[in-house]
């Protein structure tokens, strides 16, 4: 299949699989329609996604290359399909717990979505391929959330109808995943040889090799890449921040709807537009950050500390406020700050890391973030059994601890610079 057709298909798949209008009103559906309490959802249902995602991530990361990408895409689409089959037909707590297992599987295998296109396009097209595939995800989410807002805000339909619309979209996503062209091991092997700057006639090398040679190259390269990544203290520092920041970000986004749900149902009618605004505001914030001519190796610690303090303040405000507009705006600003700091982290790593290692680093950092989130969930929800508002106080304090750590790092650097300047 021609390259542009593959690009169109994978972007269509990305947009359709993200077209899930249920999501902004997921808690409202489970709480009001299925009659599940906040405590039940908080302690028995939602934590399962974290554990499922954590357990599935490493196998998904390894098997993406072993199974040559497409099977993992189909698995992702089918997992989302099963989620919404359960949303439509499942009414019990047990069914919602099974749903969270499939949801964890789906989110863990999303790594195949980005890996697939890099095999199908030339190295010179990686940047545009990344832009298009990421844009497709944002477009799908925005359209889904905007539609949900329109239908619910105008009282045109019920939460159950949103589930049916999402199920139809997931059915189409399965179809699109199935018709995507597969990847031959020789095609993937040649691409890895090219990415590793192997000299000579690549097609001839591939023709003289076997599938086991391809696997051997993958696993040997994995070991060498792990060693290459964490020898660099700068990469290690930014990876620590990425894991710490992503951990609490996942937790906040997973439980924000529960916090909104503490207010009367009539106040929760703008969940859709709130979620839709996040990617729209995140895009210009991302572009502005990329244009700033700042040495983030020097000033990044200070920015991360200030950003974490801002996020701590927003979460604490959310924990105390009973006004839905305040909760919505605080959530939007929290997400935008996360987008800004994440963009800075990624751009800083880009100067210190071979682009071939981004996927590996992202996978490891995500795994560590999920491991930390699992511990946080176990302590805050399973052990302490905190209600949702005290939970957000804890999350606010978490950000303050992160801010304190990076403020110390910046202080050490600034002190050394000051004494060095004074000495000279």
Curated annotation (Swiss-Prot):
Q: Is Ribonucleoprotein one of the keywords?
A: no
SUPFAM superfamilies assigned? MFS general substrate transporter
Query: What parts of the sequence cross the membrane?
Result: 48-68, 71-91, 99-119, 136-156, 164-184, 233-253, 299-319, 324-344, 361-381, 392-412
The cellular component terms of Gene Ontology attached to this UniProt record, alphabetical and capped at eight, are:
plasma membrane
> What does the UniProt keyword field contain?
Folate-binding, Glycoprotein, Membrane, Transmembrane, Transmembrane helix, Transport
Q: Which GO terms describe its molecular function?
A: folic acid binding; vitamin transmembrane transporter activity
- Entry superkingdom: Eukaryota
Which compartments is it annotated to reside in? Membrane
Against Gene3D superfamilies, the record matches this protein to: MFS general substrate transporter like domains (1.20.1250.20)
InterPro entries linked to this entry: Folate_carrier, MFS_trans_sf, ThTr-1
Q: List the disulfide bonds.
A: none
Task: Give the bilayer topology.
Answer: Multi-pass membrane protein
Question: Is Oxidoreductase there in the keyword field?
Answer: no
What positions does the record give for glycosylation? 35, 254
Provide the GO biological process annotations: transmembrane transport
Q: What does this protein do?
A: Unlike folt-1, does not appear to act as a folate transporter.
Q: Which family does it belong to?
A: Belongs to the reduced folate carrier (RFC) transporter (TC 2.A.48) family.
Recorded protein name is Folate-like transporter 2
| Species whose genome carries this gene | Caenorhabditis elegans
């Amino acid at each position: 299949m021609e390259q542009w057709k593959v690009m169109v298909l994978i972007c269509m798949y990305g947009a359709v699989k993200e077209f899930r209008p249920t999501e902004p009103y997921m808690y409202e559906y489970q709480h009001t329609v299925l009659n599940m309490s906040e405590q039940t959802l908080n302690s028995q249902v939602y934590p399962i996604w974290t554990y499922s995602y954590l357990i599935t991530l490493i196998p998904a990361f390894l098997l993406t290359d072993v199974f040559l990408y497409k099977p993992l895409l189909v698995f992702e689409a089918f997992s989302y399909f099963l989620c919404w089959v359960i949303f439509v037909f499942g009414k019990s707590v047990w069914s919602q717990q099974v749903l969270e297992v499939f949801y964890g599987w789906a989110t863990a295998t999303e790594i195949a979505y980005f890996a697939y296109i890099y095999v199908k396009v030339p190295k010179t097209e990686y940047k545009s391929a990344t832009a298009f595939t990421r844009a497709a995800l944002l477009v799908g989410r925005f359209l889904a959330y905007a539609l949900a807002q329109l239908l619910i805000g105008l009282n045109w339909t019920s939460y159950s109808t949103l589930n049916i619309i999402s199920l139809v979209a997931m059915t189409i996503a399965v179809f699109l995943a199935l018709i995507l062209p597969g990847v031959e091991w020789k095609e993937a092997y040649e691409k890895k040889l090219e990415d590793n700057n192997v000299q000579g006639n690549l097609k001839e090398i591939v023709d003289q090799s076997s599938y086991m040679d391809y696997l051997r190259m993958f696993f040997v390269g994995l070991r060498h890449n792990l060693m290459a990544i964490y020898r660099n203290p700068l990469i290690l520092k930014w990876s620590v921040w990425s894991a710490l920041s992503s951990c609490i970000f996942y937790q906040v986004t997973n439980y924000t709807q529960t916090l909104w749900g503490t207010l009367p149902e009539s106040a929760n009618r703008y969940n859709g537009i709130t979620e839709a605004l996040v990617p729209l505001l995140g895009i210009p914030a991302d572009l502005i950050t990329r244009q700033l001519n700042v040495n983030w190796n020097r000033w990044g610690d200070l920015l991360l500390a200030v950003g974490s303090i801002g996020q701590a303040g927003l979460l604490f405000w959310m924990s105390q406020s009973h006004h839905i507009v305040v909760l919505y705006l605080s959530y939007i600003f929290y997400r935008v700050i996360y987008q800004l700091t994440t963009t800075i982290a990624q751009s800083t790593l880009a100067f210190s890391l071979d682009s071939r290692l981004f996927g590996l680093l992202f996978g490891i950092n995500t795994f560590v973030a999920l491991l930390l989130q699992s511990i946080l969930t176990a302590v805050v929800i399973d052990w302490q059994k905190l209600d949702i508002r005290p939970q957000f106080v804890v999350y606010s304090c978490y950000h303050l601890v992160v801010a304190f750590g990076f403020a110390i790092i910046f202080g050490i650097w600034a002190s050394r610079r000051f004494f060095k300047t004074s000495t000279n």
